[in-house]
Amino acid sequence: MQRIMLRAKLHRVTVTEADLHYEGSCGIDEDLLDAAGMREFERIELYNVTNGERFDTYIIKAARGSGAISLNGAAARRAQVGDLLIICTYGPMSEEQSAAHKPQVVLVDDANRVKEIRKFPA
C-alpha cells in the first residue's frame, strides 16, 4: 500500500506579487526551492494563513535571492500581496518509507530568506 505523505513545506512565506493575467502557477525564489527540495513544475498545495483559502497549482522558478513568491493566473484571486502562505508538496511512499520519513520544513524571515531548515518532527 502507498501513502501520500508531506514531503516538504515552506512555512509562512509572504506573497510578493499577484498577476491575474499571467499563465497560472506560483513563482518561488530558487533559494527556497533548493532549501525545501522542491522542483520546477512540481504540484504544490498552498494554504493562505491570512484568509483561510486552500488551493493548488505548480511551481515555476523565480530569481535566486529575490525572495519572490508570486501567484499567477487564477491563483492570484486566492491571495494578495502581503498574505502569509504555507506551501506544501506531497508524495507517495511505501509503508516502510512512510514509517521513517521526516518532511523537510523551511522557515523564513520577513523577506522570504531561509532562516532555518528542519526535519519534522524535530
UniProtKB/Swiss-Prot annotation:
* Record-linked Gene3D superfamilies: 2.40.40.20
Q: Where in the cell is it found?
A: Cytoplasm
Give GO BP annotations, semicolon-separated: alanine biosynthetic process; pantothenate biosynthetic process
Where does the record place the modification Pyruvic acid (Ser)?
Answer: S25
Q: How is the cofactor bound?
A: Binds 1 pyruvoyl group covalently per subunit.
Quote the function comment for this protein.
Catalyzes the pyruvoyl-dependent decarboxylation of aspartate to produce beta-alanine.
User: What family name appears in the similarity comment?
Assistant: Belongs to the PanD family.
Q: Which named protein is this? A: Aspartate 1-decarboxylase
Q: Which organism is it from?
A: Bordetella pertussis (strain Tohama I / ATCC BAA-589 / NCTC 13251)
